[in-house]
Amino acid sequence: MSLRFYDTRTRQVRDFVPLREGCVSLYLCGATVQAPPHIGHIRSGVSFDILRRWLMYRGYRVIFCRNVTDIDDKILNVAASEGVQWWEVSERNYRAFAEAYDTLGCLPPTVEPRATGHIPEMIELMRRLIDRGHAYVAEDGSGDVYFDVTSYAEYGSLSNQRLEEMRAAEDGDARAKRDPRDFALWKGARPGEPSWPTPWGPGRPGWHLECSAMATKYLGPTFDIHGGGVDLVFPHHENESAQSRAAGDGFARYWLHNGLLTTGGEKMSKSLGNSLLIPEITRRVRPVELRYYLGQAHYRSNLDYSEESLREAASAYQRLENFLVRVNEIAGPIPDDVPVPEEFAAALDDDLGVPQALAVAHNHVREGNSALAEGAKERAAQIGARLRAMLAVLGLDPLSPQWAGSDDSGLHDVVDSLVSVVLEQRQEARKRKDYATADRIRDQLAEMGIAVEDTPQGPRWELKRS
């Protein structure tokens, strides 16, 4: 079977044929670094890491570009509220995202561009759009530059919308739009905000412009796959596609979108107060178990978080792991160069069917345990080799250097219980307004590498890695 993926633009599963034989160019909308990542953010990273690994297994050289949005309204708002420079917010949260990706075993990108390093490319893209009649400079002297959505006949094709039914673009203080649906390419300088010079006046880039400029710089005017969360289809990806194609670029040939991580049926987000940070979860389960949890559903499906489903995923992974470790001990070292079974490959070839692929893996565990019970060590070893190959493709190989010796979930539980007791004592001290004791407890925890953050929902703690 050839590789097939669901393409958002055509709304059908299509055979995948790369632009260049043997090479796949892949762009993923990465972090907007106004806050540390929650597990919903990282689900997208895990989904496309599995895609990348499968493409590599199939023999493709993958050029993977994952951007960093290091300047936007939210970052500026956080910086203002904290009384710090905007780049301090960006850098702090960029490091948190990088650590989260690494913790969950995501391969590093081929290139990871930051928006503020690509202002010249953005200016050139705006110039092309203005020259072609698809963008205009605001007439009020503000320095704003907007994309004229009525000038581009295909606007709305990615998100399957009709222009006349669209709502106004959410650009905040839109000062001189010709049409309320037009979106900002460039935001003219405002007092106290960072700005960069352009032929149309100083300012800073709009979110959509950033991604188009970075994607085409590193992957070319036409590339294979553009990925991201389904919540980005409109307006972000619609606007990316429109401005790039209107400028004369072919842009993405396939659009792949992962489903959302929800909790109680609602999208997980910091604004709703229902987000869970990576360190919170990895105190309950190991990082590899969290990776299994985030990657187990089909990438296009929503995944509703619950403590029960997290525990079930951890137990499911442990069944795979325990069999491999047992075979490795009984039958000798398991090789890491065995092909995956055909039914596993067929599942991933068909729009990255991870649930079906995992079913094949778990069937191997059942067969392997039966072989061990019968004393058939050679057959068990063969099954173990195939299982290891499957888990390696999914980034879950328990015998790999990434995950070997990571069985410390029990220790996490103990540490969590002990820290919770100490934090209860600190909360009691705060209630008594004994702030000296509360501060001393916090400082003592900090000396042990445990950082405490007081939130409206109560204290949170994080184990700082040295």
From Swiss-Prot:
Q: Which UniProt keywords apply?
A: Aminoacyl-tRNA synthetase, ATP-binding, Cytoplasm, Ligase, Metal-binding, Nucleotide-binding, Protein biosynthesis, Zinc
List where in the cell it is found. Cytoplasm
User: What does the entry comment about cofactor binding?
Assistant: Binds 1 zinc ion per subunit.
Family per UniProt? Belongs to the class-I aminoacyl-tRNA synthetase family.
Coordinates of motif 'KMSKS' region in the sequence? 267-271
Q: Could you say which EC number(s) this protein's record lists?
A: 6.1.1.16
Q: What is this protein called?
A: Cysteine--tRNA ligase
Cite the record's note on assembly: Monomer.
Q: List the PANTHER family hit by this protein, alphabetically.
A: CYSTEINE--TRNA LIGASE, CYSTEINYL-TRNA SYNTHETASE
**Residue interval(s) of motif 'HIGH' region:** 31-41
| Alphabetized InterPro entries for the sequence | Cys-tRNA-ligase, Cys-tRNA-synt_Ia_DALR, Cys-tRNA/MSH_ligase, CysS_C, Rossmann-like_a/b/a_fold, tRNA-synt_1_cat_dom, tRNAsynth_Ia_anticodon-bd
One short Pfam name that applies is: CysS_C
Q: Which cysteines are joined by disulfide bonds?
A: none
Identify the cofactor(s): Zn(2+)
User: Catalytic activity annotated for this protein?
Assistant: tRNA(Cys) + L-cysteine + ATP = L-cysteinyl-tRNA(Cys) + AMP + diphosphate
Q: Name one GO cellular component term.
A: cytosol
**Entry GO MF terms:** ATP binding; cysteine-tRNA ligase activity; zinc ion binding
Residue sites binding ATP per the record = 270
- Residues that bind Zn(2+): 29, 211, 236, 240
Per the UniProt entry, what is one GO biological process? cysteinyl-tRNA aminoacylation
